[in-house]
Amino acid sequence: MNYHKITYPDLENGLGVRITIWVSGCMHQCKGCHNPETWPIQSGKPFTSETIQELCNLLDKYDYLDGVTFSGGDPFHPLNVGTVTRLCKLLKSRYPHKNIWLYTGFTYEWLIRRPIYAQALEYIDVL
């Protein structure tokens, strides 16, 4: 998975003070999108173990952070969903008091009928 940036503190992409991960890749390409630069799946930079450590360091250091938001791009792009699911699972196990928001162009009804997405939804508080 690639991402464009990590924003913190972020007050605009969910309730409270958050960290927002702006992932690359979107098949929807909605008219009026605020982030068309994130549409190409290969844009941005690789999301690595160092990126995960940076994210965890922020959550460890700043207790006032309410949670993590995934935006983009589309975190549920078929090439992103595996990494996003693993990361959400890690965050929920390590930071159970933090909430996870995820913005996607897919509907809930479409997602729950597909096992790979339904599994990811187990770790997401707000879709």
What role is predicted for each listed range?
Residues 1-3, 17, 35-102, 106-117:
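Conserved Radical SAM active-site core
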Residues 2-29:
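N-terminal pre-triad scaffold of radical SAM enzymes
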Residues 125-126:
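Receiver (REC) domain switch/active-site residues of two-component response regulators
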